[in-house]
């Protein structure tokens, strides 16, 4: 009879150390002296492995020697297909002890083809200068094909590694590279962020001690992918760095059954869980008409938000749906960050819930000023406060002339601090473009400050400029999403394309079937709404369901949609 698995406990008899370690390996060495650890769940929400930090450390050390036995040298890159399972976690930490540079990479998407995925990972492996690829057992054939195509020295699963030959493990220092994080961007020319141990540990301190104010009684849970910074750092490395137990649910499980996340939060009395806005929206939609009797969210004290633009209506719907199950709107915590800063740059105060500024969109577009909207204005929009910069980190908002703007002045956001990257991997040109010699990083985001807190209004690369107006594509998208019957969040994508005498606004709309008349009516409804509400003449094109591309964190990728449109992917 198979022994029943027991999850690792929440509580520990040790005093919490808030990531005050020089390296990630030393953080795991300390975590291994206690009882806490990682619990890994199946697509159906069943526990498949309990991995105490003590066991993880022992297995990672053995695997580190096995990696060195295939000829890997200290500093070599290792491509890891980031399945949410014990083997990925073991492989990642084996790389740490071996002095190798793990580069987590995405799994294939349900709608993606084999050939496209193999080409994508081959490109990423080349960009990472990896000569080793390790993947999950379920993708072993694909891994072998990628290895052959990319000319890798080793491509397989952990079981394929040779036996431990007793190789000596290197001494790891704070200056050593820790891992390679691919930021969202072109899959043909991907950009890897080189994160060193000292930057990672600085961010883990800021997140666990200052942002989340972790307690010994805390427990985290996540469905976020481990190849994305919010999943990897936020819910694997940060919990480990403060000896917190974490429960990991595969991303695919959440996408198919989002209420598994809610159920597991209640079942394991989790206190910390994060999601982009769309995750909360999906849960609120799926729970409609269902009983809340088996859900208990009363322990959830930090319901974090990150990874996409924060939208208030879906979050209000989530509160309304789950308040009867004990969820408090005071649990919401807005945050701001990016892979180039390891993960987090700012976090809103705990226990206060979402705080928003309701702004006059016309003044925002015309004057780049954050001015309160008049009562009852149709051109008003809420923007969430994402808190002040984390301790030892700094955020500035600069105008086109490079000068720091006063509060409520909207401009480009720059960041500085111990968590900011030292460079992109093997890409000095891109590094020089975004990172100044004095350490200030051009984030590529636009926003403003109010009472010392940062507010994000959008991405600079997405901004649509028409007749001197700065138009945010999400304003157009959200108007259509919210007001056109049959459209859901994420069904609309807006961007500008070059044209004469000025750029043309294109709006792609995911349409689910319908005859010719109903499709024509949908196009006209969207165009009329954007014309009357925003004063924008848009070319509206209907595309198929699931046709709009997403980033690794599940948010809409306007840049990929624009590239596909210009390439004729969506037809004439």
From Swiss-Prot:
The keyword Membrane does not apply. One of its GO terms (biological process) is sphingolipid metabolic process. It is an enzyme of class 6 (ligase). GO terms for molecular function: adenylyltransferase activity; ligase activity. Its EC number is 6.2.1.-. PANTHER family: DISCO-INTERACTING PROTEIN 2, DISCO-INTERACTING PROTEIN 2 DIP2 -RELATED. Belongs to the ATP-dependent AMP-binding enzyme family. Involved in de novo bacterial ceramide synthesis. This is Putative acyl-CoA synthetase CCNA_01223. It comes from Caulobacter vibrioides (strain NA1000 / CB15N). The lineage of its organism: Bacteria, Pseudomonadati, Pseudomonadota, Alphaproteobacteria, Caulobacterales.
């Amino acid at each position: 009879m198979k022994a029943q698995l027991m999850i690792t406990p929440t509580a520990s008899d040790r005093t919490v150390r808030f990531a005050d370690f020089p390296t990630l390996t030393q953080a795991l060495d300390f975590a291994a002296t206690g009882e806490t650890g990682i619990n890994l769940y199946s697509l159906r929400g069943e526990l498949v492995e309990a991995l105490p930090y003590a066991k993880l450390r022992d297995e990672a050390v053995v695997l580190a020697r096995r990696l060195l036995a295939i000829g890997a040298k200290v500093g070599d890159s290792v491509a890891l297909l980031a399945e949410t399972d014990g083997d990925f976690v073991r492989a990642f930490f084996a790389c740490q002890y071996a002095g190798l540079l793990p580069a987590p990479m995405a799994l294939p998407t349900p709608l993606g083809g084999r050939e496209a995925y193999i080409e994508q990972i081959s490109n990423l492996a080349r960009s990472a200068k990896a000569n080793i690829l390790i993947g999950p057992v379920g993708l072993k054939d694909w891994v072998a094909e990628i290895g052959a195509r990319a000319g890798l020295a080793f491509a397989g699963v952990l079981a394929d590694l040779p036996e431990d030959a007793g190789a000596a493990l290197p001494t790891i220092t704070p200056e050593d590279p820790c891992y390679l994080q691919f930021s969202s961007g072109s899959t043909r020319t991907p950009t890897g962020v080189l994160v060193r141990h000292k930057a990672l540990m600085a961010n883990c301190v800021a997140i666990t001690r200052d942002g989340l104010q972790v307690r010994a009684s805390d427990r985290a849970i996540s469905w976020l992918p481990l190849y994305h910074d919010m999943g990897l750092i936020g819910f694997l490395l940060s919990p480990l760095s403060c000896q917190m137990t974490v429960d990991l649910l595969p991303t695919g499980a959440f996408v198919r059954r989002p209420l598994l996340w809610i159920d597991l939060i209640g079942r394991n009395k989790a206190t910390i869980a994060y999601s982009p806005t769309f995750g909360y929206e999906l849960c609120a939609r799926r729970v409609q008409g269902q009983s809340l009797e088996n859900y208990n969210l009363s322990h959830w004290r930090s319901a974090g938000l990150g990874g996409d633009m924060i939208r208030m209506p879906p979050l209000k719907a989530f509160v309304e749906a789950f308040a009867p199950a004990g969820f408090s709107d005071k649990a919401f915590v807005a945050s701001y960050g990016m892979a180039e800063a390891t993960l987090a740059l700012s976090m809103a105060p705990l226990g206060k819930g979402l705080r928003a500024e309701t702004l006059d969109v016309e003044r925002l577009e015309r004057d780049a000023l954050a001015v309160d909207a008049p009562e009852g204005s149709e051109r008003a929009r809420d923007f969430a406060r994402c808190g002040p910069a984390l301790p030892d980190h700094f955020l500035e908002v600069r105008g086109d002339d490079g000068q720091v703007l006063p509060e409520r002045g909207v401009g480009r956001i720059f960041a500085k601090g111990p968590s900011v990257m030292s460079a992109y991997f093997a890409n000095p040109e891109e590094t020089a473009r975004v990172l100044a010699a004095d350490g200030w990083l051009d984030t590529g985001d636009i926003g403003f400050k109010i009472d010392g807190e940062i507010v994000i209004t959008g991405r600079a690369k997405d901004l649509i400029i028409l007749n001197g107006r700065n138009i945010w594509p999400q304003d157009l998208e959200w108007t259509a999403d919210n007001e056109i019957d049959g459209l859901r969040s994420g069904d609309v994508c807006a961007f500008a394309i070059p044209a004469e005498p000025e750029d043309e606004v294109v709006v792609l709309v995911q349409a689910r079937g319908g005859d010719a008349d109903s499709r024509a009516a949908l196009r006209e409804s969207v165009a009329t709404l954007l014309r009357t509400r925003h004063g924008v003449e848009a070319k509206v094109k209907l595309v198929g369901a699931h046709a709009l591309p997403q980033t690794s964190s599940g948010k809409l990728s306007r840049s990929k949609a624009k590239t596909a449109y210009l390439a004729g992917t969506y037809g004439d």
